[in-house]
């Protein structure tokens, strides 16, 4: 009985001791040379990996090409780039928890996505192919899933990938009665649409497609767009404002949080926009690429912009 009780007591003491330590950050992603010197073990430098806890009084040592993304217990984010020694107490000095609950939710979602091994991406490739065929692509692949919600008050960028470049394309938006609501001739492989200027009806469905302006046989599949109604639009705008307050700026983590917010709300057009910004902000961080690839495979988006 005593021999069994002692390990249990010891485990409990260790557990309580661990919780007693002040966790300030957790490592979200890293690349290059990033190590940590614990205040409890000075002179020992351990590599920082995804999920590594960072405590008060620790020091982070970054190499010249290092990158480290940290998330705080309050839902704030910090990114370190370039060579230097960073005392954790200095990094955490101006953190606060205001308006961070909703950001913490999406940071947790991102962190969970990063835990997925790259092998899971390969296993989902068959799903990607089946979605592409269901869209009826014929030479043009819209960089969107087969359906997405959109805000009626936003200017959005539509991207596509063509098997062979055309001199010009025509982008067309139809209502459910196949009446043309909007069309434009475009040179290049992207177009901006000001949905707010089109007078689209809330909670209605519209159909978007792109075709070669000189060859009607070359076209994309049809993507259905659902316009958010007033109540849902107000909630999305309110929640997004809270996220922007908690994760301001145009850095990689802030953009990932915003991308994940739109993904969870079924607004994939906006999600793509922020995922692309995140990857451009930290192009060498493989963990961020895995999150984006998982998103594309889940939604059936093909290719790379």
Where are these regions (language model features)?
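Long, contiguous interaction/recruitment modules in multidomain scaffold/adaptor proteins
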Residues: 111-112, 116-245
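N-terminal post-signal-peptidase region of extra-cytosolic proteins
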Residues: 41-56, 195
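Alpha-helical protein-protein interaction scaffolds
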Residues: 244-305
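Bacterial Sec-dependent N-terminal signal peptides
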Residues: 1-29
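Glycine- and acidic-residue-biased ligand/ion/polar-headgroup-sensing regions
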Residues: 21-42, 63-68, 73-76, 82-84, ...
């Amino acid at each position: 009985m005593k021999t069994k009780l002692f390990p249990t007591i010891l485990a409990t003491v260790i557990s309580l001791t661990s919780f007693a330590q002040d966790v300030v950050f957790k490592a979200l992603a890293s690349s290059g040379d990033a190590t940590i010197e614990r205040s409890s073990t000075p002179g020992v430098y351990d590599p920082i990996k995804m999920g590594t806890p960072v405590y008060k009084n620790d020091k982070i040592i970054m190499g010249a090409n290092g990158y480290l993304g940290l998330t705080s217990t309050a839902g704030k984010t910090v990114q370190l780039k370039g060579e230097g020694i960073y005392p954790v107490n200095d990094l955490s000095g101006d953190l606060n928890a205001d308006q961070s609950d909703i950001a913490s939710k999406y940071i947790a979602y991102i962190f969970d996505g990063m835990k997925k091994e790259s092998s899971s991406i390969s296993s989902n490739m068959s799903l990607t192919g089946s979605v592409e065929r269901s869209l009826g692509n014929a030479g043009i692949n819209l960089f969107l899933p087969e359906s997405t919600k959109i805000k009626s008050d936003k200017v959005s960028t539509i991207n596509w990938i063509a098997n062979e470049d055309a001199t010009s394309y025509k982008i067309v938006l139809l209502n459910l009665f196949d009446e043309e609501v909007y069309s434009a001739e475009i040179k290049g492989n992207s177009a901006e649409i000001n949905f707010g200027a089109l007078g689209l009806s809330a909670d209605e469905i519209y159909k978007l497609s792109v075709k070669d302006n000189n060859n009607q046989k070359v076209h994309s599949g049809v993507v259905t767009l659902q316009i958010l109604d007033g109540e849902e639009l107000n909630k999305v705008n309110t929640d997004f404002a809270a996220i922007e307050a908690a994760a301001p700026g145009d850095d990689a983590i802030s953009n990932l949080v915003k991308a994940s917010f739109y993904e969870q709300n079924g607004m994939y057009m906006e999600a793509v926009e922020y995922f692309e910004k995140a990857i451009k902000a930290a192009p060498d961080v493989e963990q961020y690429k895995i999150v984006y690839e998982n998103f594309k495979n889940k939604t059936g988006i093909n290719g790379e912009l």
